[in-house]
Amino acid sequence: MRFDGGQAGWRETPRPGCTLDQRDWLTRGGSLTAHLARLGRVNVRVTREAVDCPWFDEPDAVASAPRAPMWVREVILSVDGTPYVAAHSIAPLAASKGVWQAMRRLRTRPLAELLYSDPQVERSALVSRRVIAGHPLYALATHALGGARAPHSFAARRSVFQRHGKPLMVTECMLPALWRHLDAHGDGPRSGGPGGGA
């Protein structure tokens, strides 16, 4: 399944200037929650579930009208109590009451439980970009930092999942603590830290 992420700065190849860790995590397939679980104990905190309009760079990706109502789910994924990822997912409102209705009942379970356990779900290519102030994802990520100083930009990725032709798009913004962990410990848990996962 193809996803035209070339609009609004989203692209399949990470931009020059990304570190090796950033290139890896922006293009790594499979469940992001499962990858985070290798670093420590993952917790999912739901910060918002609501009906809303899509962001300016989302309608084309899910083939919807700019003001079409969406079911929106936003969460913070923390590892050992520290926020590592802010995630924003949307599905057309009708689909959220139909083929994607289970996303409304997840509570604090990760969306990955729906996306990677169903053989009828297809995933597009991952696309990524840097987000800066002015993009709604930047505000979401900054809020996830809980008052800590935000960097000039965040690295983010997104992809579209389809089930019976109905889209669900997941956008994931990596927070500074993830890169600090990888710099210090590589792709494994902190020395002596708790393991586990979601």
From Swiss-Prot:
It catalyses: chorismate = 4-hydroxybenzoate + pyruvate. InterPro entries: Chorismate--pyruvate_lyase, Chorismate_lyase_/UTRA_dom_sf. Its EC number is 4.1.3.40. One of its GO terms (molecular function) is chorismate lyase activity. It comes from the Bacteria. It is found in: Cytoplasm. Substrate binds at R73, L111, E172. Belongs to the UbiC family. Removes the pyruvyl group from chorismate, with concomitant aromatization of the ring, to provide 4-hydroxybenzoate (4HB) for the ubiquinone pathway. This is Probable chorismate pyruvate-lyase. It comes from Burkholderia lata (strain ATCC 17760 / DSM 23089 / LMG 22485 / NCIMB 9086 / R18194 / 383).
